[in-house]
Every structure is written in structure tokens, then in C-alpha cells.
């Protein structure tokens, strides 16, 4: 598709995994001027925000190139603030997306099968149910949490 994948996270602890999964660049949002770094690469055509934070939306919108799209894929039920002017004058878009539609789920599964994509999961024993829940709630779980009975 011709995209250069840029991964962003709060710290460096996810860098190795992000690079292994195909990211060409990795920036810590707390240790670097990631907006400048992304703009220096030409700006982002699309940003997939999986873990929304109250103070990140404006910076992500700023990192988009003209006509770019910020896709909101996760929620934490908190408000996000951003500049309306940067959206209007930059011809930028914000879109929410959830995979509740059965046709979309089918397309995703077919894409995964066709491209031999295997899910990455974090397995917890049944007796570790509380730890799994706590890890998931606190953001420590890296992948989809699965309880093994």
C-alpha cells in the first residue's frame, strides 16, 4: 500500500515489538517532539488512535497532512479537546470506527486468513482471572486477554 508505518507510545518499552510488527519509525510521545518528527516525514495520511488520551488528539491532528484522517478505534469515556481550526483549514477528518457489523467482521477475518495473520494474545490461567482483569484495566496487557479454563 506504500505506507510508512509510525508507531507512537508513551514510553520506549513497546518499541521492539512495534518494529517487529512492521513499524518503520517509533516515537515516544513523552520523550520526543513526535509531531515535528512525523511532519518531517511528510505528515501522516492516517492515524489510528487505539488508546485515547485527553491531551493527545490535538497533537495527532497537527501531525496529519492536509486531508489526513484521525480514526478513533478505542474509547475510555473521557472528553478529548482539539482545535476546530486545524481540522477545517487543514481539511482534516475525524472518524470513529467499531467492528460490530457482521459483514465487517467477516471481511477482517477473511483478510487475516488470506494474509496468514495470527492473533497475538495474552493467556491467563483461570486462577489468575483477577490479575488478567487488573492488567487489562490498567493498560498492562499488551494483547487481547484470554482466560484459559
Spans of model-derived segments:
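Rossmann-fold dehydrogenase core element
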Residues: 69-71, 81-122
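Well-formed, non-transmembrane alpha-helical positions, independent of function
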Residues: 17, 37, 59-62, 86, ...
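Residues at the C-termini of beta-strands that transition into short coil/loop
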Residues: 30, 74, 98
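Adenosine-nucleotide cofactor-binding segment
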Residues: 1-59
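Helix-to-beta-strand junctions that scaffold the AdoMet/dcAdoMet cofactor pocket
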Residues: 64-66
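C-terminal hydrophobic helical "lid"/dimerization subdomain
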Residues: 58, 102-149
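Residues in the short beta-alpha loop(s) of Rossmann-like NAD(P)-binding domains
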Residues: 11, 76, 100
Amino acid at each position: 500500500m506504500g505506507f510508512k508505518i509510525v508507531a507512537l507510545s508513551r514510553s520506549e518499552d513497546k518499541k521492539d515489538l512495534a518494529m517487529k510488527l512492521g513499524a518503520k519509525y517509533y516515537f515516544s510521545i513523552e520523550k520526543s517532539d513526535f509531531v515535528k518528527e512525523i511532519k518531517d516525514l511528510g505528515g501522516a495520511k492516517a492515524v489510528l488512535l487505539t488508546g485515547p488520551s485527553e491531551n493527545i488528539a490535538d497533537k495527532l491532528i497537527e501531525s496529519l497532512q492536509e486531508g489526513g484522517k484521525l480514526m478513533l478505534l478505542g474509547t475510555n469515556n473521557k472528553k478529548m479537546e482539539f482545535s476546530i481550526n486545524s481540522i477545517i483549514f487543514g481539511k482534516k477528518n475525524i472518524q470513529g470506527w467499531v467492528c460490530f457489523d457482521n459483514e465487517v467482521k467477516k471481511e477482517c477475518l477473511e483478510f487475516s486468513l488470506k494474509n496468514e495473520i495470527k492473533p497475538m494474545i495474552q493467556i491467563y490461567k483461570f486462577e489468575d482471572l483477577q490479575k488478567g482483569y487488573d492488567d487489562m484495566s490498567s493498560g498492562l496487557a499488551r494483547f487481547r486477554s484470554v482466560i484459559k479454563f
